[in-house]
From Swiss-Prot:
Belongs to the bacterial ribosomal protein bS6 family. The keyword Hydrolase does not apply. It comes from the Bacteria. NCBIfam families: S6 (TIGR00166). It comes from Borreliella burgdorferi (strain ATCC 35210 / DSM 4680 / CIP 102532 / B31) (Borrelia burgdorferi). HAMAP family: Ribosomal_bS6 (MF_00360). One of its GO terms (biological process) is translation. GO terms for molecular function: rRNA binding; structural constituent of ribosome. This is Small ribosomal subunit protein bS6. One of its GO terms (cellular component) is ribonucleoprotein complex. The gene is rpsF.
Amino acid sequence: MIKRYEACFLFKSEEIEYKGSLEEVKKSLEFFGATDVVSNFIGERALEYPIKKQARGRYEIIEFSMEGNNLKEFESRLKLIRNLLRYMILVKIVRKINTKKIKRRNFREFRDNIDKDSLKGASKVETPTGPESTDIQEK
């Protein structure tokens, strides 16, 4: 059965190593019959802790469709790529969104979050008192 996957890859930060490793990943995807491959470069960031003696890394997210039984072989191929520091592959669940429920829920949240005290206070009109409120400039 063909499923939709989303994979996040962390590569070494050097430009040449990154491009070479990314091409290896894409060739592996083609080899294992992945379709609808969409690549998205996230950026280069500092890592919280060193991974394989690297302090920075480049993130890439790739979405693809593939047979479920090819995924294990694909993961074993990923482990052989030297400049790939980490990867994570998730099954992307596509759900039909019911907009009526969302609209109802948003309205309920809005209704429940209204500060009733501020509404009561806003309806009152303060009448000015004191001599400065009744003074009108005369010519």
